[in-house]
UniProtKB/Swiss-Prot annotation:
Name of the protein this chain belongs to: Lipid-A-disaccharide synthase
Record-listed E.C. numbers: 2.4.1.182
HAMAP family attached to this UniProt entry: LpxB
Keyword Iron-sulfur: no
GO process annotations (BP): lipid A biosynthetic process
SUPFAM superfamilies to which the protein is assigned, alphabetical: UDP-Glycosyltransferase/glycogen phosphorylase (SSF53756)
Length: 382
């Protein structure tokens, strides 16, 4: 335990994955500073640890360049108010978790005022808009990266960076028990299941629910006995998904589970999901998957000009190879998705499972403890 007067940590997490990382970090910092205060923007997991959230986290969970524009006045108001409140609070450190378009602007202002800043989860500067690294260097005292190849990129540009690994790799066992997950969820132990995960945000469901449920219908034509299960993060997403089912696949029976997305993945024989952190989770529970994603055409037209990578999903980026199928934008079509799922269900999973195990081991580093150690080290520097 670090002998120190009470510390104050300001933290901003912008979505569910950030809330998970934030909760792990808060927990580890509490071991070192039991009387510390944690304040900023966080979700239910962080708040359960005594974190004080000044705004609802979901206000920052907006997908796509075009979609952000309509929310821009509110986002700017939140950022301005947050910077003012944190400046007055004068915390020992500000930690922005992911949400780079929001957090790096906050970090820039706070660092200029003499507050130490950390950015937890490297923005994908190695993938697109690489010049952002210069702004990151100006905005942060240190970056905490989840992926091993990111640190090398920061080292090339002389930006302080610590690779900490990923909390999901620490939390998820090397073997995820399918039958135990099914028992927990009340699912048929003998059936074949496809987990359908069209995203946790409203904007994602708006784009992906239709092609995903239509693809599920097509899969059922080839596998008449297959069953479907979908996790939803809250009642609003449940209603949105039910509306899509009613409109696009009214005869499709889907078991809907609130929360427990990891258990749903573990219970499945194959997973259809949106790109993002969920793809890493699917890899760590060691299940075959198909990744599909689309955004508004304008957002895509802008983004594609800035992209520097051929793959989007985390398993493929970590492997530096296309080990899981990706169907993006124009390829996010029911028939193409269904064909990819059918192929996954029919092929031997053992070789891919071995790759998943190797990547899991690479990321298993006790991330929350390493991140907390890095923050403590930063606080101890002049």
């Amino acid at each position: 335990m670090t002998n120190s007067p009470s510390k104050v940590f300001a933290i901003v997490a912008g979505e569910i994955s950030g809330d998970i990382l934030g909760a792990g970090l808060v927990n580890s910092l509490k071991k070192r500073y039991p009387d510390a205060r944690f304040i900023g923007i966080g979700g239910p997991r962080m708040q359960a640890l005594g974190f004080e959230s000044l705004f609802p986290m979901e206000e920052l969970s907006i997908m796509g360049l075009v979609e952000v524009l309509s929310h821009l006045p509110r986002l700017l108001h939140i950022r301005s108010s947050l910077v003012k409140q944190i400046t007055e609070l004068a915390p020992d450190c500000f930690i922005g978790i992911d949400a780079p378009d929001f957090n790096i602007g906050v970090e820039l202002k706070l660092k200029a005022k003499g507050i130490k800043t950390v950015h937890y989860v490297s923005p994908s500067v190695w993938a697109w808009r690489p010049k952002r690294i210069f702004k990151i260097a100006k905005a942060t005292n240190m970056v905490l990266s989840l992926l091993p190849f990111e640190k090398a990129f920061y080292d090339q540009h002389q930006v302080p960076c610590t690779f900490v690994g990923h909390t999901l790799a620490d939390d998820i066992p090397m073997h995820s028990d399918k039958l135990a997950a099914r028992q927990l969820l009340g699912l048929d132990p003998n059936a074949e299941y496809l987990a359908v995960l069209p995203g946790s945000r409203g904007g994602e469901l708006k784009q992906l629910a239709e092609p995903f449920v239509k693809a599920a219908q097509l899969v059922k034509q080839t596998f008449p006995d297959i069953k479907f299960v979908t996790p939803v993060v809250n009642d609003a997403r449940r209603q949105q998904f039910l509306a899509a089912l009613e409109e696009f696949a009214p005869d499709l029976e889907v078991t809907i589970v609130e929360g427990q997305s990891r258990e749903v993945m573990a219970a499945a024989d194959c997973i259809l999901l949106a790109s993002g952190t969920a793809t890493l989770e699917a890899m760590l529970v060691k299940r075959p998957m198909v990744v599909s994603y689309r955004v508004s055409p304008i957002t895509y037209a802008i983004a594609i000009k800035m992209m520097k990578i051929k793959n989007y999903s985390l398993p493929n980026l970590l492997a530096n190879d296309t080990i899981v199928p990706e169907l993006m934008q124009a390829n996010c079509q029911p028939q193409l998705i269904a064909d990819a799922i059918i192929k996954q269900l029919n092929q031997d999973f053992a070789p891919l499972n071995t790759r998943f195990e190797e990547l899991h081991q690479l990321l298993k580093c006790n991330a929350s403890e390493r991140a907390a150690d890095a923050v403590v080290a930063l606080l101890q520097t002049p």
